Design a protein with these regions (language model features):
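N-terminal secretory signal peptides that target proteins for export/translocation
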Residues: 1-12
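Patatin-like phospholipase
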Residues: 31-125, 141-415
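C-terminal motif of bacterial Sec signal peptides marking the signal peptidase cleavage site
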Residues: 26-29
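Aromatic (phenylalanine/tyrosine) cluster motif
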Residues: 8, 16-22
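Catalytic nucleophile serine of serine hydrolases
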Residues: 102, 130-131
Length: 415
């Protein structure tokens, strides 16, 4: 089956770029780009977005104020679940991690809608999103009241509403092969002030919404606390929310990086942020954090479940590859992305096992064989949404291991 997602189209164009490298090299000096001054290497970890406090962290390390965060978290949980604690019952918490996948995010959007219809969808204490998962995450966080808006987002999306091709500009010194202005407008249409206000309210209750990006200068994954941003009262906070979602889904080469202003010791700098999928296809929490540490601060126990929705199949489908540079490059990148995602799933599953959290995974059935005709194919996305919705409504075949799919159950789900 041919994979026609945006990542693979970009692979083709990148190879094309190499062929024109010397021709374009003489012209790149004339190209313009936003001024970018990265923080010095010895202080970059201390950078904070200009005007904000602690609204983000590194996804590959525990925060330096972890003890204070755990104590604050315990205090919130004691207030929220006072009745449960008084009754001597365990606190039940559900977490949701949403992966990348481009237009295949329609599956996750449909699954959430169908899950609501089944009457078994829980309220999620924490929601995380990467790339297309970052687009879904705010809707999932706010619950079933936003299902219709989520459906609209993923069944009306088209290539024209996401990008404007600018291949020649990209080849001759530009920052990308496409203009992301339509994508920003699409994000602004769905990530509204009302959504932002409601995220802030849920954050104050103790729930958390996190979005992942990749900091190119630092070559590290970044986790943004969207609720903290929404509660910051900093002018332009809504724009930063839009910037983060755009960055999380900005495939390098396809879209330009998103420049975010930061400061260190009163000095102004900037960072380049791109697709969270560059550093992780899906994330939950850093392995350096042991969730059980919070249990020691609580008078009762926990029952925790982490649900992972992977917006792709387990592995790339079998394909007879032509021995040409473009098919070889496309297939190699496809396999690289797929196995990066598998590694991420194993990390989440192992951390969950260590911390006593039940792990549940759902992904696109291996029997799904419809092919998209373009980068964001509305017909394809609508069909994939419908598949996810039906699976969610009829009963999601959750798996307890990253690659332990029950093939018969998956095949039955698509029949």
């Amino acid at each position: 089956m041919q994979e026609k997602s945006l990542q693979f189209q970009i692979a083709r164009q990148c190879v094309f770029f190499v062929a024109f490298l010397f021709l374009a090299g003489g012209l790149t000096a004339c190209a313009s780009a936003p001024f970018h001054l990265a923080p010095p290497a010895d202080v970059y970890e201390d950078a904070i977005p200009t005007g904000y406090g602690r609204i983000r962290g590194w996804a590959d390390a525990a925060p330096d104020n972890l003890e204070a965060l755990l104590e604050g978290r315990a205090a919130l949980l004691k207030r929220r679940f006072a009745d449960t604690i008084a009754a001597g019952q365990p606190i039940r918490l559900s977490y949701l991690a949403l992966s990348g996948g481009g237009q295949e995010g329609a599956f996750g959007a449909g699954l959430l809608n169908g899950w609501t219809q089944s009457g078994t969808r829980p309220e999620f204490e924490v929601v995380t999103g990467i790339s297309t998962g970052a687009l879904i995450a705010p809707f999932a966080f706010l619950g079933p009241d936003w299902d219709d808006a989520l459906k609209e987002a993923y069944t009306t999306m088209t290539t024209d509403s996401i990008l404007i091709p600018s291949i020649l500009k990209g080849l001759f010194g530009g920052l990308a092969l496409a203009d992301a202005a339509p994508f920003r407008r699409t994000i602004e249409n769905f990530a509204t002030e009302e959504m932002f206000r409601l995220i802030a309210a849920e954050h104050r209750k103790g729930r958390r919404l996190y979005v992942g990006t990749s900091a190119l200068d630092a070559a590290r994954p970044v986790v943004w606390d969207i609720g903290a941003i929404a509660n910051s009262d900093v002018p332009g906070a809504l724009k930063l929310f839009h910037d983060i979602i755009l960055a999380s889904a900005s495939i390098p080469g396809a879209f330009p990086p998103v420049l975010i202003k930061v400061e260190v010791d009163g000095k102004q700098y900037s960072e380049l942020h791109v697709d969270g999928g560059v550093t992780a296809q899906v994330f939950a929490y850093p392995a350096q954090i042991d969730i059980r540490d919070i249990d020691k601060l609580m008078p009762t126990g926990f029952e925790r479940i982490i649900y992972v929705i992977r917006n792709t199949t387990d592995r790339p489908p079998y394909e007879n590859i032509r021995q040409r540079i473009l098919p070889l490059a496309r297939r190699s990148i496809s396999v690289l992305i797929a196995y990066q995602g598998i590694g991420d799933l194993y990390r989440i599953a192992l951390n969950a096992k260590r911390d006593g959290i039940e792990f549940k995974l759902a992904s696109i059935p291996v029997s799904w064989d419809m092919e998209p005709e373009e980068s964001f194919d509305q017909k394809y996305m609508t069909a994939l949404f419908a598949l996810g919705e039906r699976i969610g409504r009829e009963g999601i075949p959750w798996r307890s291991r990253p690659l332990a799919a029950d093939s018969e159950a998956e095949i039955a789900a698509t029949n």
